[in-house]
Amino acid sequence: SFIGLIAPNIARHLGFIKAKSELIASCVLGALLLCVTDSLAIFLAQWSLDMIPTGTATAGIGAPALIIIARKQMSAQDQLFFSMPKGPKFISPVAYFLLGTMIFGLLALSSLSQPSSDMGYFVIPDAFEWSIRWPRMLTAIFAGGGLAVAGVILQRLVYNPLASPDILGVSAGAVLALIFSSLFMGYSIHSLSPWVAFLGSAIALCLLLFLGKKHQFAPSILILTGISLTAVLEALVQFSLTRVGEGKYTLLAWLAGSTYRVEPESATIMAVVITACIGVALLLSRWVTLIAT
């Protein structure tokens, strides 16, 4: 997902420069972006023969956004040194009001979108429709917020506005660990996924920092190293998927990043865990500030 890249850059552009305010703003923006993208995937599915995964829709929006950010915020001298972009020093109350109105409006639009309804594109869902819709919305909101907070921490850790879990190989490490545990150890991809994914992402991050230590974590070198690490890990994932039979179709559907058929229990557990992690990040916001200095 590109949420970890886009949301922090938008937050800084709006003027949320301090670590704590940037974490909060990025969390809200990330939750909003992924929720709206999920609703867009539902809306576009009416012209498709199958459901459009939210991960696919996010990549389709995030890739052009990455190009725009790189063209507008980077210059020729950034080949040697990247710097965190600065936004306006003061944020007017009108900006807060407009941002809050936009968030409320888009969330309302997301919750009311029912493209398959005979009564129109946007209707108030009944109890049955809402029982299917709310786990998907909850998953998109908290997953987006968690990815955005992870993006803020990584960008401040390496002092690079283009750093995000998917670009630096952290997400690829989590995916590879899950694939290995599912294919070669017999575990279900849903049973131990949080712990296995955390272990894989932690190993990938440690490897990235180890490789970047020689060049004193130079932002440009670290980005290239992260892209290379991502390519290697994704190649291993593709190779692993070619070694199995029909079970790979379940894994491919999972890799697409769909929020379809998310169970209420899984969505609730994920929301609680991500809320706790975001709370810890806010409590340690001063450390995040010191990291970026």
Task: Annotate each language-model stretch with its function.
Residues 1-293:
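Alpha-helical transmembrane segments in inner-membrane proteins
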